[in-house]
């Protein structure tokens, strides 16, 4: 399939609106053209600083604006992070992601996170961080330290965005992605479905991602986990088929990207997850927690992998070079 970054919303909607089985079948065909059919990239996510975030994301338990009963924690010691990274590697993860509840890292935080990147990288793991907004200097220093991926989600469509967050603009997010890309790191960026958005917003999110100059190497598709005390605690649950449609379209229009099952997976049946893999998902977060939300534990994932005949991918150089070459051809 030809790699494109000129998708129109009408084209994406036409894909999204196909009969469900036709869409999933097409996505699986595209998936097999670019990836091993039964291999899943496994990541582990650790919160290195929890709670009291100044942002007002309406879905997030870590926001200081809401009474979610989350107990805030100061940043954890580097040696504790390394211990967790070693355990993640022993459990089959190929990538270790570190997240901090910051609007952006302060300069006083940079030596701490740079040391962390170097130490985790030395274990032979791919490294990823999500620390909020970055300026160009911070992005370059993270890249120089060996950071492979930087996560900064767009969350939802540009049109729906202001219903979800007011303390950071949509363009602020795009600017951070530009800094990450300019510094030579790989981009991890996706969004959340089930925020109370409409179908057009899911299409809009996919359109934003697929029309970036270079597609994100990793695209997390989260399902909202309602958190008591947040404004979205009682939002109507999205039908799982809409989540799978979003995954399938992401696979078709971003064929070289890893499509990751992220938050919300803990509530899904094995059959739902199998259908998501059929729709082109080929990455997931393993472990009992994703920052502060529950997740399918490592033991459950091992059982699921055995049931479906899936194997975990080994750490390797990502497909970024292939995607860049294809887009410049």
From Swiss-Prot:
Limits of the Radical SAM core domain: 38-262
Superkingdom classification of source: Bacteria
Cofactor comment: Binds 1 [4Fe-4S] cluster. The cluster is coordinated with 3 cysteines and an exchangeable S-adenosyl-L-methionine.
Residues bound to [2Fe-2S] cluster: 97, 128, 188, 260
SMART domains: BATS, Elp3
EC id: 2.8.1.6
Pfam short name (any one): Radical_SAM
Keywords: 2Fe-2S, 4Fe-4S, Biotin biosynthesis, Iron, Iron-sulfur, Metal-binding, S-adenosyl-L-methionine, Transferase
Annotated S-S bridges: none
Entry keyword annotation includes Iron-sulfur: yes
Pathway(s): Cofactor biosynthesis; biotin biosynthesis; biotin from 7,8-diaminononanoate: step 2/2
Gene Ontology terms, MF aspect: 2 iron, 2 sulfur cluster binding; 4 iron, 4 sulfur cluster binding; biotin synthase activity; iron ion binding
Cofactor: [4Fe-4S] cluster; [2Fe-2S] cluster
The protein's enzyme class: transferase
Family affiliation: Belongs to the radical SAM superfamily. Biotin synthase family.
Subunit structure: Homodimer.
Protein name: Biotin synthase
Species assigned in the record: Acinetobacter baylyi (strain ATCC 33305 / BD413 / ADP1)
